[in-house]
Amino acid sequence: MTQTTSQTESKWFAPEEFESIRQRLPILYVDAIPVRVDGQGMITSVGLLLRVTGQGKISRALVSGRVLYGERVRTALLRHIEKDLGPLALPRVPPAPAPFTIAEYFP
């Protein structure tokens, strides 16, 4: 069993173990672009996160994160939206979200 830092004991790996796994297996992540829409469904605002890079510069980022083993994509989206935007974000995510696009990242 690995050490954990959260309540999801069996779903987290130690950093060294995770790095080894990333080199051998594909790992599912979700990226989301939060938007605000008006009464007619037209996009009025697009949200990006501001993050500080390792060099101390400000950069923009998407809401994103790993999908846990056995977790539904919708649940992962809601978890990462709440983590990045706070519990009052109140996102409207469809019951069965379909990907807009699929991208492949290489560490």
PLM regions and their residue ranges:
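Conserved Nudix-box catalytic region and its N-terminal flanking loop in Nudix hydrolases
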Residues: 41-90
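Residues in well-ordered beta-strands of folded domains
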Residues: 33, 50, 103
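Active-site segment of metal-dependent pyrophosphate-handling enzymes
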Residues: 84-107
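A generic structural signal for short beta-strands and their flanking turns/coil linkers
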Residues: 28-30, 56-58, 96-98
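Generic structural "secondary-structure junction" signal
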Residues: 30, 62-64, 69, 104-107
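Residue-level signal for pocket-adjacent positions within structured domains
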Residues: 8, 13-16, 55-57, 62, ...
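Acidic, metal-coordinating catalytic segment for phosphate/diphosphate chemistry
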Residues: 2-40
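Short, flexible active-site-adjacent loop segments at beta-strand->alpha-helix junctions, enriched
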Residues: 38, 52, 106
